[in-house]
Amino acid sequence: MIQMQSLLKVADNTGARTVMCIKVLGGSKRRFAGIGDVIKVAVKDAAPRGRIKRGEVYNAVIVRTAKGIRRADGSLVKFDTNAAVILNNKLEPIGTRIFGPVTRELRTAKFMKIVSLAPEVI
């Protein structure tokens, strides 16, 4: 469960290391975001020679949360950290590699590219 001011790790090779959620997209009163939701993020920490610089604002999709996600069979999938993948304005991933596992809930038409790049789908 991600809200404004939440810090997330970046799970791709764009050069950003840490981002902060500055807005949960999808309605004016929406407070929380989970796996598969799109948020606005500000880059807080970035690699020196990366594609992305500190202070820039991007869209991102959440791929891992410590809160987890409940499946229809009753199982709960949760992770150690919160992580996101940086997106451009067309909601396509900027990076060419994804690090760490992603969940099966991302298998929609919007995020199939992320699922295909991920090393493991849980």
From Swiss-Prot:
Which terms does the UniProt entry file under GO BP? Answer: translation
**Pfam families, sorted:** Ribosomal_L14
Q: What does the entry list under GO cellular component? A: cytosolic large ribosomal subunit
Its domain of life?
Bacteria
For this UniProt record, the keywords arranged alphabetically read as follows: Ribonucleoprotein, Ribosomal protein, RNA-binding, rRNA-binding
What is this protein for, i.e. what is its function? Binds to 23S rRNA. Forms part of two intersubunit bridges in the 70S ribosome.
Q: Which HAMAP family is this protein grouped with?
A: Ribosomal_uL14
Q: Which protein family is named in the record?
A: Belongs to the universal ribosomal protein uL14 family.
Q: What is this protein called?
A: Large ribosomal subunit protein uL14
